[in-house]
Amino acid sequence: MKHSLARWGTACLVSIALAGCGGGGGGVSTPTPPAGILGALSAAAAVASNDTATNSAAPFTVLQGAGIPAVTINSPPKINFAVFSDGAVKSDLAITNVSFAIAKLVPGTNGDPDQWVNYIYRKETATVGVGPGGSLVPVATAWQATTDGKQTDPTLLAAQLVYNSAGYYTYTFKTDIKDIAQTNGVVFEPGRTHRVAIQLSYKNAAGATVLVNPYVDFTIDANGNSVLVTDPAKTRKMTDVASCNGCHEKLGLHGGGRVDTQYCVMCHNPGTTDANSGNVLTLSTMVHKIHAGKRLATAIGGEDYTIWGYQNSMNSYADVGFPQDLRNCTVCHSGANPATPQGDNWKTQPSKEACLTCHANNDGSDWDANHKPIAGTLVAAGAPAKALSNQQCAHCHGVGSVLSAESVHWNQAQVNAAKYKMNIESVAFNDTSDHTARSVTVKYSCPTRPVATPPTTW
């Protein structure tokens, strides 16, 4: 949905106040006067659903709807955003309140999943005495996706985050993502879906610290301005942080400021590796292995999944157990959730990156033994099982197959529990006159005792 604003009136201000719920266009040729923008932002701030504490899109979409591009990339990216808190526009952020990340979405090939690819990297060097056996194995150095750096020159730092009198901020990246010398070779592709996210902290009116990760998905037009992505098929959202918070209450990682999985995936992708362990920190692989930690440690060809994190702290997940059946993929992934349009990829686009986190591909494991002959036929004689491509995996495990992910993860107990109905007819408290014998009597009936039917592919 694109907004073209030529004049300002009451109706226009109302439409901008609601813009936090929708998208906007790019390349506006007639900017709105600053006074009009401030009025529009103030009106938007008065709408409770636009509060930045709960609406991750409004900081960008309201501005985009008012004719101010959320993102401009003509050299170092410039990000325009507003912060709405307690019905007002917030104007007291400092550079220490924000960190920015930027990534592009690269479509998968040969059956591989689409992946976010960050534009900014740092190099981690393995530390002597850290890692498996305390040795520098399996890698001495590794690249890790990261956030944009702060300027070191005081003058440039002062100009990196600017509050505009019209009621919004402009952040200028230190990294010029159009210069491959600054992006570890990652090429800027304006036509691809991009994402900018903020690690944002601020105080609300009650004095409480708010930690949020607003983000926006967009492409870049010929003028270098953002065009918001409104087609769910043109992004990648596999899981919603609300699913995580169902168990974790409030997800908060890396010091507590990274609270949304849509932000996590911008760094946790195939471009990030832990130098001390050699583990690739792609979010799908890492999170699945963490939740399956106990099973991996006790399975055939077992694995003690360990990551060396902040200040080389060792984090072993061998004692971590998912609080229910590991086959229940829909706890975290569901295409029926509007917030996760790619939530059904676990069953429609099976991949080694996800599946082999639970199905251990170590030498001697059941998976390795069962698939080595297949690899020898489809790849090359003597090829390891993990040499099979995702496209080859889909030949056997695609939708409709008896070996599809949905079929083999079907859980009869879970399905029956959802259908089981028990009616409590009455509850009575029983007591004696001297209170020496007390009891509670519950009468109940079970009108339905369904038998679950497995998927039709069985």
Describe these PLM feature segments.
Residues M1-A19:
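Sec-dependent bacterial lipoprotein signal peptides
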Residues V14-N50, K386-N390, A394, G398-Q412:
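Bacterial Sec-dependent N-terminal signal peptides
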Residues G23, G246-E249, M266-N269, V331-S334, ...:
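Disulfide-rich extracellular modules and peptides
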Residues A43-V71, H409-H435:
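Low-complexity, acidic Ser/Thr/Pro/Gly-rich terminal tails and inter-domain linkers that flank the onset
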Residues P59, T72-T348, H435-W458:
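Extended surface/linker regions that mediate inter-domain or inter-protein docking
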Residues P270-Q311, C355-H395, I424-A437:
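Short Fe-S-cluster ligation motifs
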Residues G321-K372, H395, S401:
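Extracellular low-complexity, Gly/Ser/Thr-rich intrinsically disordered linkers
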Residues N362-N370, G398-I424:
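A structural signal for beta-strand and strand-to-loop patches characteristic of beta-rich domains
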